[in-house]
């Protein structure tokens, strides 16, 4: 047991680095599928649904990582040891998302709403499933998109010709 601490400064460092690993992995899922939002052959809601589904499926396939991620994310330790790195890690995603929203919209708040709801609904599904994972995913997407679409630039929501 003591050997593992040779790789880390202390317990908090070990946990923060474990979170960073999970955070990078989740962000990688988001970014590797983000290009779907540029597919003009699909309407904007469908594009968002594809991206959401990839993220949802990843979370459902990794319940232990999800539980750790959520518990640490909402802890005091996250604020103290990992918040700054987390925000820097997501900076590129914030920038990518800006194109979908008017300048007056706080994109960080929108992304926080998306991720907070996604993670919360995924935790509910992992801990006490009421329906199949795919059905829970559809319901969660509807919940998120119903709010987010009110902030999206209208030109994104209009049918493409």
Give the location of each predicted region.
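Amphipathic alpha-helical packing segments from all-alpha helical-bundle domains
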Residues: 24-31, 58-61, 76-102, 108-112
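Hydrophobic alpha-helical connector segments
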Residues: 17, 31-61, 111-114, 141
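Short helix-capping/turn signature of helix-turn-helix
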Residues: 8, 71-77
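Solvent-exposed, amphipathic alpha-helical segments
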Residues: 25-36, 117-125
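Helix-turn-helix
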Residues: 1-13, 17
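Alpha-helical DNA-contacting segments of helix-turn-helix folds
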Residues: 15-25
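Hydrophobic/aromatic-rich alpha-helical bundle segments in the mid-to-C-terminal region
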Residues: 98-147, 151, 155-161
């Amino acid at each position: 047991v003591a050997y593992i601490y040779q790789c880390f400064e202390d317990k908090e460092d070990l946990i923060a680095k474990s979170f960073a690993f999970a955070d990078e992995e989740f962000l990688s899922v988001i970014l590797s599928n983000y290009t779907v939002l540029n597919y003009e052959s699909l309407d904007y809601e469908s594009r968002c649904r594809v991206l959401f589904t990839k993220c949802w499926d990843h979370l459902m396939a990794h319940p232990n990582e999800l539980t750790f991620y959520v518990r640490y994310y909402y802890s005091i330790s996250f604020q103290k040891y990992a918040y700054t790195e987390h925000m820097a890690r997501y900076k590129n995603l914030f920038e990518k998302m800006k194109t979908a929203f008017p300048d007056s919209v706080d994109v960080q708040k929108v992304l926080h709403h998306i991720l907070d709801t996604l993670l919360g609904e995924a935790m509910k599904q992992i801990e006490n499933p009421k329906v199949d994972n795919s059905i829970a995913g559809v319901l969660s997407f509807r919940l998120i998109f119903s709010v987010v679409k009110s902030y999206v630039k209208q030109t994104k929501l209009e049918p493409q010709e």
